[in-house]
Design a protein with these regions (language model features):
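Conserved alpha-helical scaffold segments that buttress catalytic/binding sites
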Residues: 2-147
């Protein structure tokens, strides 16, 4: 069965505080993800990238929630876009970026499903809070934020 897929890139790195992961969406596109998905019979619409912030342009803010304002802003935008894609009957494929983008992805999907399940596969639980985190990077708090 053919699916209609919409791709959103989120070149975010402030959740981890290290450059490099922000190149993920570009690298995945460069690796020809769109043509590969089309080759198995799906229709793909690339919506481009959500605007993310650079650490050079913003303050770290509260050290127990590094770059909280910016991470929240990007994830709010992402949640709205994911929800809109699902409302159109399409499947959202989100390319990141650091792990904090799971917050917006889960929030957008959860608007459409009352009994949403999530399978979380990661080397870490990522359920830290500002009280349990040793780094205070939000990418390690994303599952706690989503719950």
């Amino acid at each position: 069965m053919s699916k209609q897929i919409s791709i959103i890139g989120v070149p975010m790195y402030l959740g981890v505080g290290r450059r490099g992961v922000d190149m993920g969406p570009s690298a995945i596109r460069y690796a020809n993800i769109i043509e590969r998905i089309k080759s198995v019979g799906h229709e793909v619409k690339d919506l481009g990238d959500i605007e993310a912030y650079n650490s050079e342009d913003v303050e770290v803010g509260n050290l127990k929630f590094k770059y909280l304002r910016e991470v929240v802003a990007v994830n709010t935008d992402l949640a709205q876009q994911v929800s809109a894609i699902i409302s159109e009957g399409r499947f959202p494929l989100v390319l990141g970026g650091d792990h904090s983008i799971a917050i917006g992805t889960i929030a957008g999907v959860s608007e459409h499903y009352d009994n949403l399940g999530l399978i979380w596969v990661d080397a870490h639980a990522d359920i830290n809070t500002h009280e349990t985190s040793s780094s205070w990077n939000i990418h390690g708090m994303r599952l706690a934020a989503s719950l």
